[in-house]
Amino acid sequence: MKQKREIWIDNVKVIACILVILGHFFQSMLKAQIVPGNRIYLWFNQSIYSFHVPLFFICSGYLYQKFSRIDSMSKWVRNIWKKLLVLGIPYFVFSSVQWLLKTMFSNTLNVEMDGFLQVLFAEPLSPYWYLYCLYFIFLITPTFNSGRSAVFISGTALILKLLKINGVYSNIYIIDVVMSNEIWFAMGMCLYAINITGFSQKKAARNLGCVSFIVFLIASMIHIPDTLFWEEGKAFYTGIWACAAVILLVAYSFRNSEQDTGFWGFFAKYTMPLFLMHTLFGATVRTLLLKAGTDSIAIHILIGIPVSFIGPVLLAEIMRRYRLDFFLYPGKYIFKK
């Protein structure tokens, strides 16, 4: 029997994607010295970076536990091969394109690029590091098949995170990034195991979501350091409240929805293209405006933000028409039923 689609998952990813796009846009504006790094900007950047990508990991963990059963070597091998194609093809394609563009326009963008192989295999670019990290999380994480396995996997993920918070590093990128993010993936698996969708039918979910949001706001404003990001401990503790607020409020709001429509339906359809291509369009617009001698904050925002959203959507439609959306959704073509 086909399982009912859970609309709230799509819409949580929509929120995460929008915040990722805005975060990258304004961060690149700061690096190009177009916007000042004042307290308001620092608070915004620190706050959203504590939870926007964690939301993606939580959604991935939830869907992994819901649709997969990795309890044998043969299933593990099949899953890893599938994830290598589904995540690896867009990762390598769009990482290569971004590396090429940033290398060509490094002087204008005020960035210094690492070597091509270094970027692909050792220190991925944003936002593609998420796909890179997610693959390795799939590589090491079995699904829960009992309460004991749930405790073991979640406990291990928490220990890894606490070690990282307390300064235990390997100085190997992939190990450190998995240590940071395995916990969010495990949280997503736990949410499915405890039936968060069922809980979202109750008003208690809405109330808890509101409380979580208030706690997040208070925690985020207690101390705003002169850095782009909080230290890992504060980002984790604050991010938990933000993720809880988003998930509970979105799940409650869409508890009776069977399909996305309007704003949510549109963005849910294009989450992957937006995630993969927003930096390409944003960087291109910023480069052209700077080359034209325009450093007005208003002009960069009024042109750059719409193009960061509209550009990927239009290109995704063109790619779909010529079946080039294979590079966005390789699984749609490789694993046809």
Report residues per predicted region.
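Hydrophobic alpha-helical segments of polytopic membrane proteins
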Residues: 143, 148-155, 188, 194-217
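Alpha-helical transmembrane segments and terminal signal-anchor/GPI-anchor hydrophobic tails
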Residues: 198-266, 270, 280-283, 288, ...
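Aromatic-anchored segments of alpha-helical transmembrane domains
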Residues: 21-25, 96, 155-168, 210-225, ...
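Interfacial loop-to-helix transition and helix-capping segments at the boundaries
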Residues: 43-53, 118-132, 165-187, 220-246
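Juxtamembrane "helix-exit" motif on the non-cytosolic side of transmembrane helices
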Residues: 29-34, 103-108, 163-171, 219-229, ...
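Short juxtamembrane and helix-loop transition motifs at transmembrane-helix boundaries
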Residues: 108-121, 135-143, 164-171, 197-198, ...
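Membrane-cytosol interface segments of multi-pass membrane proteins
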Residues: 1-159, 292-337
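Structural signal for the C-terminal ends of transmembrane alpha-helices
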Residues: 64-72, 142-147, 187-199, 222, ...
